[in-house]
Amino acid sequence: MLLVSTVSAVPGLFSPPSSPSNSSQEELLDDRDPLLVRAELALLSTIFVAVALSNGLVLGALIRRGRRGRWAPMHVFISHLCLADLAVALFQVLPQLAWDATDRFHGPDALCRAVKYLQMVGMYASSYMILAMTLDRHRAICRPMLAYRHGGGARWNRPVLVAWAFSLLLSLPQLFIFAQRDVGNGSGVFDCWARFAEPWGLRAYVTWIALMVFVAPALGIAACQVLIFREIHASLVPGPSERAGRRRRGRRTGSPSEGAHVSAAMAKTVRMTLVIVIVYVLCWAPFFLVQLWAAWDPEAPLERPPFVLLMLLASLNSCTNPWIYASFSSSVSSELRSLLCCAQRHTTHSLGPQDESCATASSSLMKDTPS
């Protein structure tokens, strides 16, 4: 479950713990704790179902809504975030589930490299899509004249393309670091492991991944959200010159209802800001802390159950992403309720008031303003 492995030390990205290279043939067999293996499989299965189901539902709701009109900019980002998280489920969690079940990677060298590459693509894409979405919200609020200059409502806009391009590019080292290698000095037992030219290569690479996948996006997201909050706060609290102008005119600019609407919008933005940053840090921090610990400390408890289970939580953020943005988007949450309502109708094969409620929900969404 470590990010990378050498043939003499630690297991590979999301691979089960393996024996060191000087082990005998008997020791290279699967001697893992059966209870721990079952716990790993149960945890990975739960994460896979949660990621696939939640992102599939939200993506289905967005596609259903998009068929009836132009895609809103926020919906474009949420849909690509769902795609990135589905890539995490299919190319990261599912291979790890099979890997944990068999203890060794069973497949050719090309498949080993492809799996490792796609695992990292999913991690980068999920983080960078959130960062791209936050940058777009910052531009829309703080630089509104530039918000839609580059095709904000298109299904593929510039921030989305940049996020995918960086994810594909930064994952390329995986193709050269990992390969099917003998884990026991001629034992004939092979696993998908990494090899570095220098002893410090493992520490440098794990630290680089932690910075690029977790630290840098987290700082960027937090900075953008602070700037968004400051911009909204500045629009609500007039400066000295604006207050003087209002006194000279002898009247207020704007109605109480308009001010209340802006205050509600700011409160919603602040809540979303806190949720995004806190959940992002809480989901990624345990995983990368144990990764860095394992890379920098030769005495790290690699096979202790808490340590092993924490290494499986790289995809935890993909479980929460769709629900965070769906809950703060009235149009997405309404479409999701309508989709679930109609799915229940088809499941029960019932006609009558339930059909009418589905139709009413769908028609009302046509007038819903994207948020």
Swiss-Prot record:
Residues in coiled coil: none
Gene Ontology MF terms in the entry: peptide hormone binding; signaling receptor activity; vasopressin receptor activity
One Gene Ontology term from the biological process aspect of the record: negative regulation of cell population proliferation
Positions in the Cytoplasmic compartment: 64-77, 136-159, 221-271, 329-371
Tissue specificity: Kidney.
Compositional bias per record (Polar residues), positions renumbered to this chain: 357-371
Keyword Glycoprotein: yes
Transmembrane segments: 39-63, 78-98, 114-135, 160-180, 201-220, 272-293, 309-328
Stretches in topological domain Extracellular: 1-38, 99-113, 181-200, 294-308
Positions glycosylated per UniProt: 22, 185
Compartments, record wording: Cell membrane
Residues with a covalently attached lipid (S-palmitoyl cysteine): 341-342
Keyword annotations of the record: Cell membrane, G-protein coupled receptor, Glycoprotein, Lipoprotein, Membrane, Palmitate, Receptor, Transducer, Transmembrane, Transmembrane helix
InterPro entries per the UniProt record, alphabetical: GPCR_Rhodpsn, GPCR_Rhodpsn_7TM, Vasoprsn_rcpt, Vprsn_rcpt_V2
Assigned GO CC terms: endocytic vesicle; endosome; perinuclear region of cytoplasm; plasma membrane
Main localization (coarse): membrane
Keyword Cell membrane among record annotations: yes
Region annotation (Disordered) ranges: 240-260, 349-371
Pfam family, one: 7tm_1
Membrane disposition: Multi-pass membrane protein
Oligomer status and interactors: Interacts with ARRDC4. Identified in a complex containing at least ARRDC4, V2R and HGS. Interacts with TMEM147.
Family recorded in the similarity comment: Belongs to the G-protein coupled receptor 1 family. Vasopressin/oxytocin receptor subfamily.
Job of this protein: Receptor for arginine vasopressin. The activity of this receptor is mediated by G proteins which activate adenylate cyclase. Involved in renal water reabsorption.
Descriptive protein name: Vasopressin V2 receptor
